[in-house]
Amino acid sequence: MMLTALGLMSGTSLDGVDVALIETDGKQVKAFGPSGYRPYSPVERNLLRQALSEAVHLTRRDARPGILAEAERAVTQAHAEAVAAFVAQNRMRPEDIDIVGFHGQTVLHRPEKRLTVQIGDAPALARAIHIPVMHDFRAADVEAGGQGAPFVPVYHRALAQSLEREGPIVVVNIGGVSNITYIDGNDTLIACDTGPGNALLDDFMYRTMNQAFDTEGKFAALGTADEAWIARALELPFFALPPPKSLDRNDFAALKLGDVPPAVGAATLTAFTAAAIARIIPLLPRRPRSWIVCGGGARNLTMLRMLRERVGSATVEAAEALGWASDAIEAQAFGFLAARGLKGLPLSYPATTGVPMPMTGGVIARP
């Protein structure tokens, strides 16, 4: 049975709430609906940055000490506003939507401690929007010993299977963290985080230029990357680990550029993201023939150029060039995952998160 599923995603980039509608049975996508976006205000973004700092001390996933309780209320309210605006703009009614997939805002991800924390009050959201809400997608995977990320690969596979091209294909999502999904003609599905995405660069731009991000990579294009710094950074043990593996937004926070000109810093961090993505190639079964880039990084032209320089003869293209809605893919994915969760279908696999067996997940909150 086809479901009308609305996905909501607030990623590690802390930019806002993405909203996207799809028609799906949890196995294939029948139709893409409209998408929307509700940006976080500077006050909300600052609150979330504080929540990330405070969350490093958490030992229980349900604890909300100090600023975390306030941040959870803000996240829930922002998502409720995002849904209300989306429904109004598209002249829909709540009853037109069968299920909402609500990721929440990750504030801590420590799979080695079997701990992952996403803030956002799903029962309160369901009451506010009058639609059933599927949430808490990662918990079952982490509790079973999985990495709890990435979760979008099953959706990437559904998208890639609609392309008539020779594999292997890698779909790269460059959000706060970068992750890849490797898809080949043998139906092999491998996924992992590869390293930083936009988070280090965004934080650097905010700190040095008071800008939220480097628009189209124009600032990085003015500088020359410090390749020696990148080589040292790539010596971190994470980069030699085989898939599956996952990261937290703050895992690279200790890397310091030192006192460098802003353009050099931006170029170095952009190149580091590209180099970290390319570093996964020797750890894959076969060398990819094509790379499809989605997420915020797909709009960074310097990032795309730097990735092309590092992947040999393979093609690198933005998802938009294929007719995919790059900014909406992660939100669409959580609508897709909500449909899969409702039907008890797997959300994660041994080769995506390292979980011992294919795992379903998600908890439903009804209005």
Curated annotation (Swiss-Prot):
Q: What class of enzyme is it?
A: transferase
Q: What is its EC number?
A: 2.7.1.170
What Pfam families does the entry give?
Answer: AnmK
The name on file for this protein is Anhydro-N-acetylmuramic acid kinase
Pathway(s) the chain acts in: Amino-sugar metabolism; 1,6-anhydro-N-acetylmuramate degradation; Cell wall biogenesis; peptidoglycan recycling
Q: Which PANTHER family match?
A: ANHYDRO-N-ACETYLMURAMIC ACID KINASE
- This protein's species is Bradyrhizobium diazoefficiens (strain JCM 10833 / BCRC 13528 / IAM 13628 / NBRC 14792 / USDA 110)
Concerning its family, UniProt says: Belongs to the anhydro-N-acetylmuramic acid kinase family.
- Function in brief: Catalyzes the specific phosphorylation of 1,6-anhydro-N-acetylmuramic acid (anhMurNAc) with the simultaneous cleavage of the 1,6-anhydro ring, generating MurNAc-6-P. Is required for the utilization of anhMurNAc either imported from the medium or derived from its own cell wall murein, and thus plays a role in cell wall recycling.
Tell me what gene encodes this.
Answer: anmK
Single Gene Ontology BP annotation: peptidoglycan turnover
Q: What superkingdom does the record give?
A: Bacteria
